[in-house]
Design a protein with these regions (language model features):
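Caspase-like (clan CD) cysteine peptidase catalytic core
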Residues: 2-29, 33-95, 156-158
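A short acidic, often aromatic-flanked loop/helix-cap motif at beta-alpha or helix-coil junctions
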Residues: 1-5, 120-123
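Active-site-proximal C-terminal subdomain of hydrolase catalytic domains
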Residues: 67, 75-171
Length: 171
């Protein structure tokens, strides 16, 4: 599955089929892990369903690989949403959320990642309607609750601003 995931990223998203004005949204729900490198730095991974724990290095996908793929895409906006334990190691903080900032930011290229938990956090699997708490709240946000300024658009910044406190309130 690792190879299929990476092939889909490279063959369908990081090639000429994705144009400079496109927007890409990628959602992953599954397992994640953190490994400490020899340097002492932690590295986050997503773990495909068919991964063998004995073959972690070749079966898991490092968050740095995902960041590199996102940077290689021509698309104007790329957002990865990760519902996995320890996925926060792929996270970079966003900036201010004023509406003028958001309008200006929409004109620029952006790479964003929203994660279910921090670098050292496990996340709850059991939530409403058979989803994890994170995914359930994410679906509510995408259905409209995440449009915090009421302009009819849900930005990555608005999504994060809605999801984080809503997940905390539910879990």
């Amino acid at each position: 599955t690792r190879n299929n995931i990476l092939a889909a990223f490279h063959d369908r998203l990081a090639d000429d089929r994705t144009g400079k004005n496109d927007r890409v949204f990628v959602f992953f729900a599954g397992h994640g892990a953190t490994r400490q490198l020899a340097s002492g730095r932690d590295l986050g991974y997503i773990i495909p369903v068919d991964s063998d724990p004995k073959e972690f290095a070749t079966d898991a996908i490092a968050m740095t690989d995902i960041q590199n793929i996102a940077e290689s895409m021509q698309a104007k906006h790329v957002m990865f949403v990760m519902d996995a334990c320890y996925s926060g190691l792929g996270l970079t903080r966003g900036g201010p959320s004023s509406s003028s900032f958001l309008r200006e930011n929409a004109r620029r290229s952006a790479r964003q990642m929203l994660t279910a938990g921090g670098a050292d956090q496990q996340v709850a699997d059991a939530g409403p309607n058979g989803h994890s708490v994170f995914t359930w709240v994410l679906l509510q946000a995408l259905a409209g609750k995440g449009d915090l300024n009421g302009d009819g658009l849900i930005t990555g910044t608005e999504l994060a601003a809605y999801v984080a406190p809503a997940v905390s309130a539910v879990s």
